[in-house]
Amino acid sequence: MAEQRIDTQYEDLLRHVLATGTPKSDRTGTGTRSVFGHQLRYDLSAGFPLVTTKRVHFKSIALELLWFLRGDGNVRWLQERGVTIWDEWADENGDLGPVYGVQWRSWPTPDGRHVDQIAQVLHTLRTDPDSRRMVVSAWNVAELDRMALAPCHAFFQFHVADGKLSCQLYQRSADLFLGVPFNIASYALLTHLVAAEVGLEVGDFVWTGGDVHVYDNHVEQVTEQLTRTPYPFPRLAVRPAGLFEHEYEDFEVLDYRHHPAIKAPVAV
């Protein structure tokens, strides 16, 4: 394990957006301060990047990722496990349309077949790890109108070097206070799981944001968060299992020292 240190990249980005962000209107009518184009890089051998300046609910993150990996587009599975983060967008039957997991596991083709992008990437990692085509996309232009919410974290790519698996995510729309801490931890967890599945160590997780914004009704909460001193990142322990067989109980976040949670409204 790399030497543990305090990582302030996320908090520094919050400060940057508050200080330099351009006022913009948005789909929700809330208003934001926005910057365009930013990148964060986390060495996953140095700790699990779970924000410490507020409590982040890891159980919701992990269960949402398992739900994605199931290829599910209905919130019932999440609700049965006490996760309600998608409820605002679901219809009366719990359906969200062909959102993230559906595209990951069952991207429709013009001839009526479906592509399992995750299985495809696993195959390439095993047979051609130097490939530059290990990309998974949730941004299916032909089906955006059927999705309850267009993908914010739109696509990700894997890269292998020196026996280590790295992952880069492109997030076209980044709610920096509420969403991004979830997304960073989710894809860091995914990188751990995929690395274990194909017999690699973890490398870096690279987060790339497009429209990176703080909502106007989150400024007070962000200001409070930035008065807090970050702690070292926790560590992640994962019980061995197949990628598609994992359950939440397989995951344990160790030594997660954090400040109290800060509540804020979700822009729907």
Curated annotation (Swiss-Prot):
Instruction: Enumerate the residues binding (6R)-5,10-methylene-5,6,7,8-tetrahydrofolate.
Output: H57, D175, A267
Keywords of the record, alphabetical order, are: Cytoplasm, Methyltransferase, Nucleotide biosynthesis, Transferase
| Compartment(s) | Cytoplasm
State what this protein does.
Catalyzes the reductive methylation of 2'-deoxyuridine-5'-monophosphate (dUMP) to 2'-deoxythymidine-5'-monophosphate (dTMP) while utilizing 5,10-methylenetetrahydrofolate (mTHF) as the methyl donor and reductant in the reaction, yielding dihydrofolate (DHF) as a by-product. This enzymatic reaction provides an intracellular de novo source of dTMP, an essential precursor for DNA biosynthesis.
> What protein name is recorded for this chain?
Thymidylate synthase
Q: Which InterPro entries match?
A: Thymidate_synth/dCMP_Mease (IPR045097), Thymidate_synth/dCMP_Mease_dom (IPR023451), Thymidate_synth/dCMP_Mease_sf (IPR036926), Thymidylate_synthase (IPR000398), Thymidylate_synthase_AS (IPR020940)
Query: What pathway does the UniProt record associate with this protein?
Result: Pyrimidine metabolism; dTTP biosynthesis
Coiled-coil parts of chain: none
| Major place of residence | cytoplasm
Which residues make up the binding site for dUMP? R27, R132, R133, R172, S173, A174, D175, N183, H213, V214, Y215
Q: Which reaction does it catalyse?
A: dUMP + (6R)-5,10-methylene-5,6,7,8-tetrahydrofolate = 7,8-dihydrofolate + dTMP
Q: What CDD domains does the record point to?
A: TS_Pyrimidine_HMase (cd00351)
Question: Which Gene Ontology BP annotations are present?
Answer: dTMP biosynthetic process; dTTP biosynthetic process; methylation
- Catalytic residue positions: C152
SUPFAM superfamilies with a match to the protein in the record: Thymidylate synthase/dCMP hydroxymethylase
Q: Which GO terms describe its cellular component?
A: cytosol
As recorded in UniProt, its EC number(s) are 2.1.1.45
Q: Which NCBIfam families match?
A: PRK01827.1-3, PRK01827.1-5, thym_sym
Give the protein family: Belongs to the thymidylate synthase family. Bacterial-type ThyA subfamily.
Query: Oligomeric state and partners?
Result: Homodimer.
PANTHER family per record: THYMIDYLATE SYNTHASE, THYMIDYLATE SYNTHASE 1
